[in-house]
């Protein structure tokens, strides 16, 4: 599926090269961002993979060798830097489209993954210049189905439950036999403090057993017309990620734990937790563990956890 997306981006980029069309820069920027998104996910899951920036036939695609680490890094950083230059500051009326902040945010994630925190810090500072985006007052508000594509959402899959354009009940609490396949475990729940208001997003409903906690982050109201669909969106990049990656970049680049904790505390205090100080977190190793736990609490079931643990060496 990822290579299908890459093929489509390459196809559009090949055909629009030199064309005189309206919104040329925006469309090119979107393709560069999406191609980078898919290549980055391939890299994080499989390591170096075959890459191409042009359309190739299926027969020729089989002949492309795996790239090197340097080639993957160059492709991602060049394309995302160009995408950030081309994309507008806001998506306009079509809110599901990406703006330049998406390119800067993904670029920062690439830099952190490749062990370049200073470059990530610079990219995130560019992202934060876009004042159209910011933290919502609570994590729950980010996922309110009546508050879709809010100011915290940077890049999300847009769903609409009408006409079967939702995502079923996969991420909504239900009683189907496989419901617990994506529910939190007791071990994961243990990283939350009891007064953390994000806990309600993974444990809102009555426990039906001592080992089951129901995920309600993507809750949508029941609709008798669309009984098998949920219309809530799925965010892949949101402003809380900008904040916590900036904390990571500060710590890893040697800017000081006090400055890093100042940014980590932004999501903690939003969740109703006390601020951490350098008396609580005394080393870079302790900070990495605290950051991993905070990212786990903030981004539960949003597809970050494994990648975070790998990147942080935990």
Where in the sequence are the language-model features?
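Elongated scaffold/linker segments in the mid-to-C-terminal portions of large proteins
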Residues: 1, 125-253, 312-314
């Amino acid at each position: 599926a990822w290579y299908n997306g890459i093929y489509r981006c390459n196809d559009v980029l090949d055909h629009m090269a030199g064309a005189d069309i309206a919104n040329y820069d925006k469309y090119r920027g979107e393709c560069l961002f999406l191609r980078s998104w898919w290549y980055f996910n391939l890299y994080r899951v499989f390591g170096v993979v075959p890459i191409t920036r042009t359309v190739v036939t299926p027969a020729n695609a089989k002949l492309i060798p795996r790239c090197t680490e340097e080639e993957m890094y160059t492709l991602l950083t060049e394309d995302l830097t160009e995408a950030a230059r081309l994309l507008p500051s806001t998506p306009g009326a079509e809110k599901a489209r990406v703006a330049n902040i998406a390119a800067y945010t993904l670029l920062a994630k690439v830099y952190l993954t490749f062990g370049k925190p200073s470059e990530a810090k610079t990219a995130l500072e560019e992202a934060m210049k876009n004042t159209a985006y910011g933290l919502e007052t609570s994590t729950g508000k980010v996922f309110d189905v009546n508050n879709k594509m809010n100011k915290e959402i940077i890049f999300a899959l847009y769903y609409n439950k009408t006409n079967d354009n939702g995502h079923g009940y996969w991420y909504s609490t239900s009683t189907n036999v496989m419901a617990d396949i994506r529910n939190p475990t007791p071990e994961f729940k243990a990283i939350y403090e009891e007064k953390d208001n994000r806990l309600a997003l993974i444990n809102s409903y009555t426990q039906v057993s001592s080992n089951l906690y129901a995920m309600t982050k993507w809750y949508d109201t029941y609709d008798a017309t669309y009984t098998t669909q949920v219309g809530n969106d799925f965010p892949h990049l949101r402003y809380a990620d900008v904040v916590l990656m900036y904390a990571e970049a500060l710590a890893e680049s040697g800017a000081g734990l006090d400055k890093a904790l100042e940014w980590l505390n932004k999501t903690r205090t939003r969740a109703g937790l006390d601020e951490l100080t350098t008396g609580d977190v005394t080393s870079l190793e302790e900070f990495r563990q605290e950051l991993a736990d905070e990212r786990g609490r903030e981004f539960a079931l949003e597809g970050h956890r494994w990648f975070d643990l790998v990147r942080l060496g935990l």
